[in-house]
Amino acid sequence: MTGHAFQCLLRDADIRLAFRAVSAVLAPGGQFVFETRNPACAPWQNWVPERSEIALVAPDGVSVRLWHQLVERQGDYVTFDQYHAFADRTAPVISRSCLRFCTLAQIETFATTAGLRVVRAVGNWQGAALTGIEREIIVHLQRV
């Protein structure tokens, strides 16, 4: 599971269902690996236009500016808007999203209830220690 897709599992029931499904199909000794953003880094603090805006040129040659705007944070949940301002349009296209920021302890609890255990958790894909400054939590689960 990549691209921080885990964060789109908003309800406890959704995470439990996903982890139970993984547990049911995971081969003995196999691992399920996924990434999620580290809530200790509070990345949503940078989801404001002045810190998130980038400019790109689309494959068709149209210039586009992208940025994020934090809407609200409530507990584990962060809601934000993503703006796409195309040079050939008068108004930006806006997409609203909500993501859940689980701690490693929460992930461990969900895993345990599904018959899984965390066998490794690191702070990036290169294997750095998980700290408050690493932007990622890379989780390796194994069936118990």
Question: Which functions belong to the PLM regions below?
Answer:
Residues M1-A13:
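A short SAM/SAH-binding and catalytic strip from SAM-dependent methyltransferases
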Residues A5-C8, A40, W125-A128:
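Short histidine/acidic/glycine/proline-rich micro-motifs that form metal-
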Residues R16-P28:
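A short glycine-rich, Lys/Arg-flanked "PGG" loop and its adjoining helix->strand segment in the class I
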Residues C98-V144:
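C-terminal lobe and adjacent flexible extensions of AdoMet/dcAdoMet transferase-like proteins
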